Amino acid sequence: MIGPVAQATSRIRVGSGGVMLPHYSPLKVAENFSMLSALFPGRIDLGIGRAPGTSAQIAFALQRDRRQASPDDFREQMDELLEYFGKGLRELRFQSPEVSLLGSSPQSAVWAAELGLPYVFADFIQPGGPAIAAYYREHFRPSVALSEPRVSVAVWALAAETDQEALRISASARMMLLSLFRGRLIPVPSVEKALAFLSHENAPIDTLPAGRRIITGSPERVRESLEAVAAEYGAGEVFVVNIVHDPSERLRCYELIANAFRLTTSHTSSI
């Protein structure tokens, strides 16, 4: 979707959040994102992650060599990828996207700091990352790509016209998370199905697995909460993640958050 979205817009940055590098050849990733960067200069971001990001079956299907377990060589893959975007292979003349390292563990912060890359912490996977973000800042090594540490945070956030309506439509995400923690990966359920599930489980509508958080509420409440999370991490950018069953409600959620932060453009300006 990066190409079509970039083609349909002219101002916003578009990117991956992210490419799970262990599933792919670094050269192939470099080729794909170099082409996108050549087509849309200065607008393409490449977020790189290490997690499987999918079920065991799909991870196996993506495996580079199914005859043996995939090696744990993520750092070597990152070095190779950055080499293509850095000195690179002269004959290929790669265009470079902006590369960030995504993570939810202390090790990801170590790598981001060592490589001198922007760091995006997945609070929606593993809350409690401010200490990890602080480690990244303290140990950051300036690079050609980045002279100072830069932290972003990705967080669950869901806005609706009222606090109660936001809480209601968040039931789909809560059912998915509870099912995932029990080892079941399910499609996004309807709000009605999710509410019935929570009722059957005798779980409050605002229930979540221990340690997880979903920001819900009116646009103003969500804005205040997102600003608080950004301050907690010292983040200059916030990635909003949500799971909503109805596509129109999901779009409205993003519109409400954008309006709360006054991110909307005038009718005459391009996106």
Features from the language model and the residues they span:
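Conserved, mostly hydrophobic/aromatic
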Residues: 5, 36, 112, 166, ...
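A conserved active-site cap/scaffold subdomain adjacent to cofactor or substrate pockets
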Residues: 107-109, 113-125
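Hydrophobic faces of well-ordered beta-strands that scaffold small-molecule active sites
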Residues: 14-16, 44-48, 97-102, 117-122, ...
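The substrate-binding groove and active-site-proximal loops of carbohydrate-active enzymes
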Residues: 16-23, 215-216
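An alpha-helical appendage that flanks or caps ligand/catalytic pockets
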Residues: 60, 66-84, 88, 129-235, ...
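N-terminal beta1-alpha1-beta2 module of alpha/beta enzyme domains
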Residues: 1-12, 270
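Acidic-and-aromatic substrate-binding clefts and catalytic sites of carbohydrate-active enzymes
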Residues: 21-27, 125-132, 159, 246-248
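Flexible, glycine-rich active-site loops centered on histidine and acidic residues
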Residues: 22-86, 127
